[in-house]
UniProtKB/Swiss-Prot annotation:
Protein name: 3-methyl-L-tyrosine peroxygenase
Gene responsible for this protein: sfmD
Note accompanying the cofactor annotation: Binds 1 heme group per subunit.
Record pathway: Antibiotic biosynthesis
Functional pH dependence: Optimum pH is 9.0.
Organism of this sequence: Streptomyces lavendulae
Length: 365
């Protein structure tokens, strides 16, 4: 499904976006997300609960077509939220704005957590539309994590004090022969999913930090479990967005990342939602160490999820451009490879997490 002909898009949005996705794709300002489990429950649990019930009504999980129909019915049943575009926003950098325009994302005024529920349903519908029509070449485990990320997000938002419970994910059939803009369609829609799950993971990490600071072990465990499932979903989103061969990448995707289509140096590093997630991760070490000291395995399993997400990103990048090609972000004349840049970020991000449970490092159990 693409945008209706009468839809008004922001000035500067590239023409290709509306050809491959339903836009505008509305998201709130991630800086306004709640920071505690109690705030989260008050802000969004009722709406998220409606979404969970809608996606799990009898028969909704029999196959992807049934899940798509349930998703669309659920979206239609929810009362509208949001009060139009944010407009001028002092918290938005020029690079943030460039990235939003490139993917048809419109920052919307209104209750940010409820907007996240709606964005999750919109992103899920976008993926299911393609899968019902075209199938998917994602391996089954990646597909389960990818779609399972939506269930984890909505389930946790509905009951923030409990770890999200997995739901049945119908499998996707193998992808059919390529059609026009197939790769670009997955690229744009996969990025919509990534931004939704990145907001969710940032939110879960913030709630983990607050719970740990208050000594709330059940709350910290629930938040950590949500963060792990959402990071696994982010991994699936990266693999889905990068499901293209090198020819498709060079012909359909790379031109959208470079002038004249894109501003110079546009990069996913400047996604507003990614920036907020990275900020939360950078400040989370004490919380993960506290949780580890309580004997929890969540810090180790989240660390593994984060590492594997970066490994998948490295794999996608290497598949597209090889392990020696310079990054689009590289300074003029630099020979630093794109794969090397991602690997360095992997090292930095993992340094925010304890390497193993504290009780295994000689601390009292």
């Amino acid at each position: 499904m693409t945008a209706p002909a009468d839809t008004v898009h922001p000035a500067g949005q590239p023409d290709y976006v509306a050809q491959v996705a339903t836009v505008p794709f509305r998201l709130g300002r991630p800086e306004e997300l709640p920071g505690t489990l109690d705030e989260l429950r008050a802000a969004v649990s009722a709406r998220a609960g409606e979404a969970v019930r809608g996606l799990n009504r009898p028969g909704a999980r029999t196959d992807l077509a049934a899940l798509l129909a349930a998703t669309e019915r659920t979206r239609a049943a929810l009362a509208p939220v949001g009060a139009g575009p944010v407009g001028d926003d002092p918290s938005e950098s020029e690079a943030n704005r460039d990235n939003d325009l490139a993917f048809g994302i419109v920052r919307t005024r209104g209750p940010v957590a409820e907007l996240l529920v709606d964005a999750a349903l919109a992103a899920l519908a976008g993926i299911l539309e393609v899968a019902v029509d075209r199938g998917s070449d994602l391996e089954d485990a990646a597909w389960q994590r990818f779609i399972g990320g939506f269930d984890a997000l909505l389930g946790w938002l509905a009951d923030p004090h409990s770890a999200p419970r997995p739901a049945t994910v119908p499998g996707a059939g193998p992808a059919g022969p390529p059609v026009h803009q197939d790769a670009l369609r997955r690229w744009v829609r996969g990025h919509h999913v990534f931004m939704v799950l990145a907001q969710g993971c940032a939110l879960a990490t913030a709630c983990l930090r607050d719970s740990a600071a208050r000594g709330d072990l059940p709350g910290a465990e629930a938040s950590a479990a949500a963060a792990e499932a959402l990071m696994r979903g982010c991994q699936g989103a990266l693999l889905y967005a990068g499901d293209a061969n090198r020819e498709q990448y060079n012909e359909q995707i790379r031109p959208t990342l470079m002038p004249p289509v894109a501003p110079p140096k546009m990069s996913g590093l400047h996604w507003r939602d990614h920036e907020v997630l990275i900020k939360e991760l950078a400040g989370s070490r004490d919380a993960w160490e506290w949780l580890s000291a309580q004997g929890s395995e969540r810090p180790a399993t989240f660390r593994a999820a984060l590492a594997e997400t970066y490994d998948s990103h490295i794999g996608v990048c290497g598949h597209f451009v090889g392990d020696q090609s310079p990054s689009l972000l590289a300074a003029q004349g630099s020979t630093r490879s794109a794969v090397g840049v991602i690997g360095q970020f992997r090292k930095i991000r993992l340094s925010a997490l304890p390497e193993q449970p504290a009780t295994q490092q000689g601390e009292p159990s």
